[in-house]
Amino acid sequence: MSSASVVEAVSVNSAIPQNRNYEYVLEVANVRKEFPGVVALDNVSLRIRPGTVHALMGENGAGKSTLMKIIAGIYQPDKGQVLLRGEPVRLEKPLDAQEAGIAMIHQELLLMNPMTVAENIWIRREPKGRFGLIDHDEMRRRTQELFDRLNINLDPEAEISELSVASRQMVEIAKAVSFNSDVLIMDEPTSAITETEVAHLFDIIRDLRAKGIGIVYITHKMNELFEIADEFSVFRDGQYIGTHLSSNVTRDDIIRMMVGREVSQMFPKEEVALGDVVLSVKNLSREGVFRNVSFDVRAGEIVGFAGLVGSGRSNVAEALFGVAPADGGAIQINGEFVQIKSPNEAIQHGMAFLTEDRKETGCFLPLTIQENIQSAVLHQNFVKKGFVAEAELAKEAVEICNKLRVKTPGMDEVIENLSGGNQQKVLIGRWLLTHPKILILDEPTRGIDVGAKAEIHSLITQLAHKGVAVVMISSELPEILGMSDRVVVMHEGRVTGILDRAEADQVKIMDLAAQ
């Protein structure tokens, strides 16, 4: 289809029931949401028709999840409004959304243990019998009635802990229907279930659609969009791009809408003379997580890893660093086979690993900058005859902080008090102190401001000039394209392609990432 036809307005779906006095069951009008230093949503609008499946598409960080959390009452918009059945509503908490008829099934399912299926569905709404006691027989009867309506084959008295991910999703759907919801939001519902389970889920979604429920379906998988969605909307960089009928577009049209921007000039890539292969990975696998992952990284080379949420990129990084070791395949460093079963072994082999979640698995928040920086080297360069060379360590830590331009009153400042960008610089400084041969960076600029991003990109380039082999995982395609010599693309635990810098572009990467 032509680019001109991509922007055509969506016509009314003739299959939608017409016995209502409103056209849209849910509307979001001119919503803006800001977080410190970030505009997550910029004047966004969205309309959901009753009796349709409406998919939301966009790169990671496009604003989809933020918008859904506003609709579900988790966040409140700074500007704009939400309308339900044509009337403005104020959703100050998730319970407000539930009572208004909006239910959300999160990617991380929120069912409670140790409780039964029925107890989870009717929590805080349990039917009461004589003397105000919970009527368990009635609760079971209501649950079974729900399951019969939805064609769900589960025991209402089963413990949640005994259920598969797919079965737990069915419980979440039944719970949503029990609120008589008019709107059901589903966030990546097929990310952890089998093809057979997906088929069953789609049957239930079609049944809910036939009952007039408006379903908002967040997905990265284009085949699902064409199979289950009536229409879809695309978001990019916190902005609404457009809404279209699924039957009117091609896969290439959608990719073009999702990635329609040029790489920013803040990602300059300097040419570096590449050396020998430092890291060689062959058929690396971990059962149920990733399989047969192979790639090489040369001295001075930056190899970017691209892929959608759940593609397995971070799992590969954790395996390389011994956080969650692989159970198959081989790793070579400078031509020698190595076994890495722990982070300490990885550090001894010259590896460094910047994790994707600096607050949870990176920073030691109650400790000082000095203590955070020195934490990786206490058993490395600065230990001599059982004693830590404290003066030498402190001196180099200060030099690194100055080099990275960490904004802080002093080395004794608690890292929790720093901005996200400065925390990230400290974590990079921690690994620079180990003088690594291999640097693995997982989302190195996530959640930091533009200025700090540029400084970190410059630092990565400097390390490449010094011969460090860099593996960089990023969900930002401009960052991947702007910084990488080669791009490894993953999808559902496997490598779907490796692109040289000259041939890589956003459309090719998204095509490989969505296979």
From Swiss-Prot:
It catalyses: D-ribose(out) + ATP + H2O = D-ribose(in) + ADP + phosphate + H(+); D-galactose(out) + ATP + H2O = D-galactose(in) + ADP + phosphate + H(+). Keywords: ATP-binding, Cell inner membrane, Cell membrane, Membrane, Nucleotide-binding, Repeat, Sugar transport, Translocase, Transport. One of its GO terms (cellular component) is plasma membrane. It is found in: Cell inner membrane. GO terms for molecular function: ABC-type D-ribose transporter activity; ATP binding; ATP hydrolysis activity. It is an enzyme of class 7 (translocase). Its main location: membrane. SMART domains: AAA. ATP binds at G58, E59, N60, G61, A62, G63, K64, S65. The keyword Lipid metabolism does not apply. InterPro entries: AAA+_ATPase, ABC_carbohydrate_import_ATPase, ABC_transporter-like_ATP-bd, ABC_transporter-like_CS, P-loop_NTPase. CDD domains: ABC_Carb_Monos_I (cd03216), ABC_Carb_Monos_II (cd03215). Part of an ABC transporter complex involved in carbohydrate import. Could be involved in ribose, galactose and/or methyl galactoside import. Responsible for energy coupling to the transport system. Belongs to the ABC transporter superfamily. Carbohydrate importer 2 (CUT2) (TC 3.A.1.2) family. This is Putative ribose/galactose/methyl galactoside import ATP-binding protein.
